[in-house]
């Protein structure tokens, strides 16, 4: 329950979360449970604005909970929705830009069936997942192809537009496994780097792969 999660020590919650990754989600979930249990007296907020104030909850999650949980008229914009709207309206604004996100959120809100928001949100997400797919979309049988800007222009594959590519960075660590009488030395990471507040074997971060290979 939310109450049990709220009073549980964070270290215990980490242990139960072990292996799932994304530990920031674990921390946010714990903090949100405490807010609901203690500050809100166990009552889950029932407005978009209040839900958005919960730690770890962004516009997408807040809209989804508002629509599916409370029947409120908020458009849910996920990858499927971005794809459907960008192709149908021929919008070449990058979906990963701040202005692009605002444009698509407003467009989705304008298209929303106010009195049937949950059904509409589910329908457009399902449509993007099964018909207006990223690869090999079913344009030939799509019921909206006569009005789809990208289909009529033969540019379906060009949408949605993205401006950023995630740049991966390699890091090299040398870990020390120190054992004495069946017990191992570990340390707790601090700061805001990777694995924050998690336990690890003592280690050094090396500057280059060559240095790591010859350590």
Give short role names for the model-derived ranges.
Residues 1-140, 144-153, 157:
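Catalytic cores of DNA base-excision repair glycosylases
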Residues 126-215:
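Intrinsically disordered, low-complexity, charged terminal extensions of DNA damage-control enzymes
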